[in-house]
Curated annotation (Swiss-Prot):
CC cofactor: Mg(2+)
E.C. number(s) listed in UniProt: 2.7.8.26
Pathway the protein acts in: Cofactor biosynthesis; adenosylcobalamin biosynthesis; adenosylcobalamin from cob(II)yrinate a,c-diamide: step 7/7
Name by which UniProt lists this protein: Adenosylcobinamide-GDP ribazoletransferase
Keywords: Cell membrane, Cobalamin biosynthesis, Magnesium, Membrane, Transferase, Transmembrane, Transmembrane helix
Source superkingdom: Bacteria
Job of this protein: Joins adenosylcobinamide-GDP and alpha-ribazole to generate adenosylcobalamin (Ado-cobalamin). Also synthesizes adenosylcobalamin 5'-phosphate from adenosylcobinamide-GDP and alpha-ribazole 5'-phosphate.
EC top class named in words: transferase
Membrane topology per record: Multi-pass membrane protein
Family named by the database record: Belongs to the CobS family.
GO cellular component terms given for this protein: plasma membrane
Catalytic activity: alpha-ribazole + adenosylcob(III)inamide-GDP = adenosylcob(III)alamin + GMP + H(+); alpha-ribazole 5'-phosphate + adenosylcob(III)inamide-GDP = adenosylcob(III)alamin 5'-phosphate + GMP + H(+)
GO MF term set: adenosylcobinamide-GDP ribazoletransferase activity; cobalamin 5'-phosphate synthase activity
Length: 250
């Protein structure tokens, strides 16, 4: 098996619970596999679309949307959702940098974290419910693509905010070439749905604004803040599609 395929499988195993019975060694250049983040997002989205389509054949639209969101959490192991909760607990605790990082590291979930997680899950649920017949399939497929590409932007030209953790695998290690490749893959996937392509073009700006906000708080990015960026991007993506289509622009 060549290096690129090894990296792709490693990233697929890292970001999902998809059972792949293959041992792939963690290489020193594991971070180079970040170019596959949007591709893995597309795989997740395709599986979500199949799940939604299957459920909608027998169940009401609202229940199908609920099961799709639940399957999304299961498929990813709640990896980024957990980061969202930890980030909101820490960043908005009104403490200093060291205390914020300690709070984010704590496995216990606080009020801010619970509220953030509930809000984003409800936003996804009602976002999927609100998508029209011509938007829902692309919306479901491309939502995970946008979230994972946002992580790539979040890792570029920044520093790691703590001494250890999963975030060190990617943060500050993304080259301009890797950024361009992953962005191109995202644009190719989004090109099949014009509202999504517009969102993809705006995504670097939004990601940079988020990154700047986090950097002011803790002087860097962490795995938790990347997870939060992913979840917030997915929610904003659905909201953007609803707003732009609701305005009759597409």
């Amino acid at each position: 098996m060549n290096i690129d395929m090894n990296r792709f499988i490693s990233i697929l195993q890292f970001l999902t619970r998809i059972p792949i019975k293959r041992d792939v060694p963690m290489e020193e250049a594991f971070h180079k596999g970040i170019i596959y983040f949007p591709v893995v997002g597309g795989i997740i989205g395709a599986l979500l679309m199949v799940a939604y389509r299957g459920a909608s054949l027998y169940l009401a639209h609202s229940l199908s949307a609920l099961l799709t969101v639940g399957f999304f959490v299961f498929l990813t192991g709640g990896l980024h959702l957990d980061g969202l909760g930890d980030t909101f607990d820490g960043l908005y605790s009104n403490r200093n940098k060291e205390t914020i990082l300690e709070i984010m590291k704590d496995s216990r979930l606080g009020t801010n974290g619970v509220l953030a997680m509930v809000f984003i899950l409800l936003l996804k649920l009602y976002g999927i419910q609100g998508l029209g017949e011509h938007q829902i399939y692309w919306g479901i497929i491309l939502m995970p693509v946008m979230g994972r590409q946002a992580i790539v932007y979040g890792c570029y030209r920044t520093i790691y905010g703590r001494s250890q953790g999963l975030g060190h695998l990617f943060i500050g290690k993304v080259s301009k070439k890797e950024l361009l490749i992953s962005s191109l893959l995202t644009f190719i996937l989004a090109a099949m749905h014009l509202p999504s392509l517009i969102f993809a073009l705006l995504l670097p700006i939004g990601s940079q604004l988020y990154k700047g906000h986090v950097m002011k708080k803790i002087d860097g990015m962490t795995g938790d803040t990347l997870g939060s960026l992913c979840e917030l991007t997915e929610g904003c993506y659905l909201l953007f599609i609803l707003l732009i289509t609701g305005a009759g622009l597409f």
